[in-house]
A protein has these predicted regions:
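Terminal substrate-recognition subdomain of acyl/acetyltransferases
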Residues: 1-42, 62, 80-120, 147-309
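Conserved beta-hairpin
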Residues: 54-76, 81-83
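Generic structural signal for beta-strand residues in well-ordered domains
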Residues: 53, 113-116, 134
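A short beta-turn/loop motif at secondary-structure boundaries
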Residues: 52-55, 183-185
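Conserved beta-strand in the GNAT
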Residues: 68-79, 105-109, 122, 127
């Protein structure tokens, strides 16, 4: 389909119009839409074509000039989860239901249950014809969605590069999460950014951004130095105690809990939690990963029980 897509030479005199399109409209002009996605996006695969036909809760936005498709956004509706027990299970790492990629990630990693409760739209794909890139089409598409989408916040997950981070920042998004591992598809760390729209969405963006900025200096993430701050916050807050509890007694990941663990150990005797302190030095989980994690969780759990007495 990429070969069938007809590219349009850049012409600054042409007027670009942005509209929302239904799934039926996209499918009726499939060669054009999917051709653009394949031309401009490394992640687009035949599986995406199947999703176009089968998946529900999709939204599409097109930037056109004289019936030529110059740019497009493919977005997915997320959030609106009303089951509080399910949300708590997601936060603890006990459940990972299908879908809701960003709400689940923020609920689990940043402990923000509101991310699951609020309604959001995730930008799954954004593509602009190569000859029309760097001319504001992508920014205009995002601004149109911001003004017209009836949701609490927008989100995007992307392979982190300085250039992409700057683009999303220019569009009004705040970086709120960095994945632990390099993605096979991009060779980059996955990143999540948010843009609040409603009052609750704006508050969620603020909380998520502040939490990210507060915790990244105390993580062992390879990109932590990119986000260096003047001072490191060592104070144990309620969110840290929740992080410690969910690591010790449930399935919170070590990487997500690490800033809280480092704050916790800062207030303890140097002889406390020797396995965890060894991990701080070696960056290696003791023994094999499964049993080593159990030991680290147990060490923190025992200390939490003593501190609670």
């Amino acid at each position: 389909m990429e070969d069938d897509f007809k590219q349009t030479p850049y012409d600054k005199s042409k007027v670009c119009q942005i509209t929302e399109r239904s799934q039926e409209e996209i499918l009726s002009s499939l060669t054009q839409f999917y051709g653009l996605m394949t031309l401009a996006h490394y992640r687009t695969s035949p599986l995406d074509l199947r999703r176009l036909f089968d998946a529900n809760s999709q939204c599409f936005f097109a930037a056109e000039s004289e019936q030529n498709l110059l740019g497009a956004v493919w977005a997915l509706e997320e959030g609106g989860i009303e089951d509080s027990a399910l949300i708590e299970a997601i936060q603890q790492g006990n459940r990972r239901p299908k879908g809701n990629l960003v709400p689940q990630a923020l609920c689990f990693h940043a402990q923000l249950q509101k991310a699951c409760e609020l309604h959001s739209l995730r930008i799954s794909r954004i593509a602009v014809q190569p000859m029309w890139q760097q001319h504001g089409i992508g920014t205009q598409l995002i601004e149109y969605i911001t003004q017209n989408a009836d949701v609490d916040y927008l989100s995007v997950s992307f392979g982190y590069t300085k250039e992409l981070a700057q683009f999303w920042q220019k569009c009004g998004f705040s970086l709120v999460h960095l994945g632990e591992h390099l993605e096979a598809s991009s060779g980059c760390y996955s990143a999540i950014a948010l843009k609040g729209i409603s009052a609750q969405g704006i508050e969620l963006e603020r909380e998520a951004s502040q939490s990210f900025q507060r915790n990244i200096p105390l993580s062992f993430h390879p990109l932590a130095q990119v986000f260096t701050t003047i001072s490191v916050d060592w104070e144990l807050l309620d969110e840290d105690w929740l992080s410690l509890k969910n690591f010790a007694y449930f399935h919170r990941s070590l990487a997500s809990a690490l800033p809280a663990i480092r704050r916790f150990l800062m207030n303890l005797d140097e002889k406390d939690c020797p396995l965890m302190r060894d991990y701080f030095i070696t960056k290696q989980i003791p023994y094999n990963k499964k049993n080593g994690l159990k030991l680290l969780r147990s060490e923190i759990a025992q200390k939490l029980k003593k501190e609670a007495k």
